[in-house]
From Swiss-Prot:
InterPro entries: Glyco_trans_51, Lysozyme-like_dom_sf, PBP_transglycosylase, Pep_trsgly, PLipase_C_Pinositol-sp_Y. It comes from the Bacteria. This is Biosynthetic peptidoglycan transglycosylase. It is a single-pass membrane protein. Peptidoglycan polymerase that catalyzes glycan chain elongation from lipid-linked precursors. One of its GO terms (biological process) is intracellular signal transduction. The chain crosses the membrane at residues 22-42. Keywords: Cell inner membrane, Cell membrane, Cell shape, Cell wall biogenesis/degradation, Glycosyltransferase, Membrane, Peptidoglycan synthesis, Transferase, Transmembrane, Transmembrane helix. Pathway: Cell wall biogenesis; peptidoglycan biosynthesis. Gene3D superfamilies: Biosynthetic peptidoglycan transglycosylase-like. HAMAP family: PGT_MtgA. It catalyses: [GlcNAc-(1->4)-Mur2Ac(oyl-L-Ala-gamma-D-Glu-L-Lys-D-Ala-D-Ala)](n)-di-trans,octa-cis-undecaprenyl diphosphate + beta-D-GlcNAc-(1->4)-Mur2Ac(oyl-L-Ala-gamma-D-Glu-L-Lys-D-Ala-D-Ala)-di-trans,octa-cis-undecaprenyl diphosphate = [GlcNAc-(1->4)-Mur2Ac(oyl-L-Ala-gamma-D-Glu-L-Lys-D-Ala-D-Ala)](n+1)-di-trans,octa-cis-undecaprenyl diphosphate + di-trans,octa-cis-undecaprenyl diphosphate + H(+). Its main location: membrane.
């Protein structure tokens, strides 16, 4: 038995470096696909974004830092929440397959005319980044984000993507998911959120550590009203049921 293992090891060592690298990459690729398949059925106990927040706190010697994260099935979340998230972050979510090329084209056009480069990430891309990857901007992370997004869209129904997004999105410093945010900031459960509550939560998503749900400034109040109007124009929660 040992000789057989040793013989295979010797064969592997004689392979050229590029072949060994290819095998390693294939194994990593298969493992990443397996991750996606597992979370199609298993609710994630943590996301990589949460892990990163812990590391950030510990690097600042905040040893008592604790996340606020409470998983909540989509059936236990008020219908006003998913449509508010879609209205705020990705209005073509039911229509695309993970990448909104129209939004990407508009963002690049806006940037070419001298404007700042606006984000065009879909909800699916945000789930891929928040669940599996690290924060920050780099071509490597963006490439991996695209890889995970492809498999997420292939294996998960849209309903599952929204469910995980609603549970791992950050709504305040260390506050993840609509249930934790609703309890902490609005003293409600996610099932009891009305349209105004849901829009207020969704309004802080671009910069959850910058804006305060409990004490919203003029921008958040304006954005919350805008999200409510957009959700209504999309057709409310029926917009998600139709696709």
């Amino acid at each position: 038995m040992y000789q057989w293992i040793q013989r295979d090891s010797d064969v592997y060592q004689r392979w050229p470096w590029w072949r060994r690298l290819l095998i390693v990459l294939l194994v990593l690729a298969l493992m990443s696909v397996l991750q996606v398949i597992v979370f199609r059925f298993v609710d994630p106990p943590l996301s990589m974004t949460m892990v990163g927040r812990y590391l950030e706190a510990w690097s600042d010697r905040q040893w008592n830092f604790r996340l606020h994260y409470v998983w909540c099935d989509l059936e236990q979340i008020a219908p006003s929440v998913p449509i508010s998230l879609v209205a705020a972050e990705d209005q073509r979510f039911p229509l695309h397959h993970g990448f909104d090329f129209d939004a990407i084209k508009k963002a690049l056009g806006h940037h070419s005319r001298g404007g700042h480069l606006r984000g065009a990430s879909t909800i699916s891309q945000q789930v891929a980044k928040n669940l599996f990857l690290w924060s920050g901007r780099s071509f490597v992370r963006k490439g991996l984000e695209g890889w995970y997004t492809f498999w997420i869209e292939l294996f998960w129904p849209k309903r599952r993507i929204l469910e995980i997004y609603a549970n791992i999105a950050e709504f305040g410093d260390g506050v993840y998911g609509v249930q934790a945010a609703a309890q902490r900031y609005l003293e409600k459960d996610a099932a009891d959120l009305d349209e105004s509550d849901a829009a207020q939560l969704a309004a802080v998503l671009p910069s959850p550590r910058r804006y305060n749900i409990q004490d919203p400034g003029p921008y958040i109040r304006w954005r919350s009203s805008w999200i409510q109007r957009q959700a209504e124009q999309l057709g409310g929660s029926a917009y998600l049921d139709m696709h």
